[in-house]
Each structure stands twice: as C-alpha cells, then as structure tokens.
Amino acid sequence: MTTMTTKFRDVEIRAPRGTELTAKSWLTEAPLRMLMNNLDPDVAENPKELVVYGGIGRAARNWECFDKIVDTLKNLETDETLLVQSGKPVGVFKTHKDAPRVLIANSNLVPHWANWEHFNELDAKALAMYGQMTAGSWIYIGSQGIVQGTYETFVEAGRQHYNGDLKGRWVLTAGLGGMGGAQPLAATLAGACSLNIECQQASIDFRLRTRYVDEQATDLDDALARIDRYTKEGKAISIALHGNAAEILPELVRRGVRPDMVTDQTSAHDPLNGYLPVGWTWDEYRERAKKEPEAVVKAAKQSMAKHVQAMLDFQKMGVPTFDYGNNIRQMAKEEGVANAFDFPGFVPAYIRPLFCRGIGPFRWAALSGDPEDIYKTDAKVKELIPDDEHLHHWLDMARERISFQGLPARICWVGLGLRAKLGLAFNEMVRSGELSAPIVIGRDHLDSGSVASPNRETEAMQDGSDAVSDWPLLNALLNTAGGATWVSLHHGGGVGMGFSQHSGVVIVCDGTDEAAARIARVLTNDPATGVMRHADAGYEIAINCAKEQGLHLPMITQ
C-alpha cells in the first residue's frame, strides 16, 4: 500500500516524561519517547513535516506511519521486534527478550540506483524516506549531538596551525541548521570568534534562542567590524549573518579579508532541498523545487561551485580550510571545479587518530525528562575518568553553555573500554534509584566503525579502502547479535545519496541484570568494530589499541 502520503500536520509532539509507562516495558517506551523527542519543536528543524534535521531527514515516512509506529510500540511485547522500512512500520515478529525491540533500515538503494534522482522519485510515491543519520534512527538530541565533535575539530586545528591557542582568531563558516548550528558554539568553546552565514532567518532565530550563536550582524560590514573588535579584545563571540555563502565568501576574497580558519556546513549534500542558489529567495527555491527539480539542482550546484572556489582561494592565502562533511566538494567538482578536493575533509585532517582508538560521539538521554539525571551522570563520568582534564573541561563547558533541547541529554567522546564502563555505571545508577528513570545510550552514525563515506569519515584511508561498506553492515549485525535495544542501517546520511552507508545503535539502561549483560556486550563490541576497521586498514594506532584491549582479530592480533 502506497496511498499514505500526509507529510504535514499542524501538531506539537513532545515525549512523555517521568516514570509512568505508556508502553509495555522500558525497552519499548525508550524508542517511543526518543522518536517523539526527535519531533519536539525544541529539537526538530521542521517537525510539522516530520523533518528533524539535514535537509529532509525525517523521523517517519509520513504522519500515518508515525501514528502506526507509536501504536505498535505501545503494544509491542517484550519478545517481539518491530521492523521499520524507510520510516514505515512493516512487520512485527517473534524474537526473544535479548533481541532488539526495533530494527530500522532507511534510504537503502541498490548501488546502481543510489542517487538523488531515483530516491526523489520513490519519495514522491511514498516508497522511501531519507533518514539522515539520527533522524530516522530516533536518537537526535539537537545541535549538542555534534557540538563536541566540532569542538574537537577546532581544537585540533588550533593545535596544528596556531600552537593550540585560538584566542584572537576567527572561523568563517556557513550553515546554521541542525548540524551546522553547532559550529558557532563549538568555536566559542574552543576560544575563537566565528562568522556564521545562514540564508534562512528562522534558523538564525533558532540558534539565538537556544544560545548556540551569540548575536546577529545587520550586514557584512557590521559583521566584519564586530569580528575585528572581538578578536582584538580576545573575546570568543559567535556572529550570525543572514545571507548566501556563495555570494559572501567570494566578496570576502575580493576584499582580501583573511579568516584564521574556513569550513562549511550548509546542507550541500542535498541540492534540491538544502542549498539556496545565488539570487533566489527561500520561498522561490522551495516552489521551483516542486516544478523544475533538475533546473533547481543545477542552479544550486553552480552556486556551490562558487562557494568552493572561494574556499580554495582562502586556502591559497594560507588559511587552514577544510570540508566538514557535507559533500560540497563533490558537488563543486561535478560543476567543473576540478581541484575541489585540494582542501581536505575534517576526518583525515583532524579526527582519524581518535577513530583509531574507537573514540567517537557517545551520547545519552534521560527518559525522565529531569536535567538532574544528566547532571548526576556528568559527575559519574568525572568520577570514573578522573585523569582526563580535557573531558572534564568539556563537561563543565557543556553544563554551562549548552541548552537542553527536548529530553535532557549529554554527549562526550569516549572510546573502547570506557563506553561499557560508563554504560554499566549508568545502569547501576538506575537500579539503585540514584537516577529517577532509565537512560538511553546511543551515538551518531559518524563513528569509528559504523560508516563508509569516502568523502567524509573514510576519506583517504591509507589502504585505499574508502568505499568498502562491509564495515557498517558488520557493525549493525554485531550490535543486533549483542542485544542492542534498536539498531539502524542507513544510506546517504551527511553526504547524500550514493556517497555513504552507515549504522546506528541505541541501548537502554533500565537497571536490570539483563540490561547490564547487554550493555557490556554492545558498548564493548560497537567501538571495537571501529578499532578493527582501522587496524585492518593498517593504522598502527588501531593495531596497538586492539592488542592493548585484547581484541581477537585473526589476521592482526593472533
């Protein structure tokens, strides 16, 4: 049946709070609450159209599917598993109590047809849904979900290029959507000013309201004057500017303005829905996308080419310039910018050594809705990892500066060994009553062992295995076997159709012994696949980590 097509509903969704169950167990209550949390108006970019973030990244295929998912989760037995196919609940099957309660597959296409044109045809027929990464896998926590990764990137860039000190320096970037909205706060936390260009005033307003950006300039001259003043004063202030990056970056080049760092996080991965062509209004863009999609895609990619050319010009000035994973270089290359890949992606430039040790975006949310539960887990993290001053600094800054969106949540980058240690501790806190309700633990699909994305996470692998996508499939299979609460397998997140495959995992800490056993398996195995993947590619850091952690890798450690 393909007649269910309602994508707009004027309704406000918020997850239940407290300890009263609306489902039959916490293992089904958790995905229910996190699905609804993804559509909380304080969390999602366009919740009335089911869009969570990232262009058209949705939580459910349409409202009829959302209703049926909610109803099914409320009635799901403790030994049943719900299957979700591109945002549509398609089956409930008898499994067992340690099996996942939900298995999700979003946006997956046979490789020959894995492109936006074919996907958009399916989407128009209500046969597919773009799940992005954490939108369709129900573990989005707002812009906080990427803040620390962006912060770690800026800090490492500062270490490499500016002797570890970003005071008095400024970052030029664009995009203040659900992901890009993390950039201004991350730059501030790293000690730098930032100029953040955004073409939708509503997105700027959202970031101002949630304190991710400090202030808005009236025009480019005003923005540059503020940057000049704040950098001279050594203040780390973030500035939003309403405009089109494909116009403003070339103008900055023309003026000879020299930022200290340049990147971008517009929704360039989706030219039909996420990147405004030069000279167009947003309303015109959306209307023409319906009537003449091919022309719109062409116009958007032409503007991306101008944007990337300006980034290349900044690189020629000696400005550290990097792609932040939105595939804008690929789009520009397809429009004739032959050297678009002359500036690197952020993973090979700054993050890969962390991935080699299984370190990535570990996140958790308090199903109670009580911020105190998160503050107590913050303290537990510090207690269990007493010597990591960098992590403690992050947690302190996060508590001070990051506003919770929807259910209270936290993210911190930790790796193999520590994830299981923290998960077991959180489960014990639930068992003892120290936390008022269960905790869910998940992560971004952007992690060390869960993604194949040659223009982002697996760019420039030293053995040339950038495009091998067996790894996220193995990761999903292993997490399913280990007893995760829900597991997802997606295509196209971050960089768009045809350019990535990736998997997600979420596990519930409900305070039971059974949960502890599942947590120990899943939160060990999941980051271990990242160490395995990088060790297999020949990275010495990963090989040494595998040996230190006692991983059984037949071709490497035996």
Curated annotation (Swiss-Prot):
InterPro entries: Urocanase, Urocanase-like, Urocanase_C, Urocanase_central_sf, Urocanase_CS, Urocanase_N, Urocanase_Rossmann-like, Urocanase_sf. Its main location: cytoplasm. NAD(+) binds at residues 54-55, 132, 178-180, 198, 244-245, 265-269, 275-276, 324, 494. It is found in: Cytoplasm. GO terms for molecular function: urocanate hydratase activity. Pathway: Amino-acid degradation; L-histidine degradation into L-glutamate; N-formimidoyl-L-glutamate from L-histidine: step 2/3. One of its GO terms (cellular component) is cytoplasm. NCBIfam families: hutU, PRK05414.1. Catalyzes the conversion of urocanate to 4-imidazolone-5-propionate. This is Urocanate hydratase.
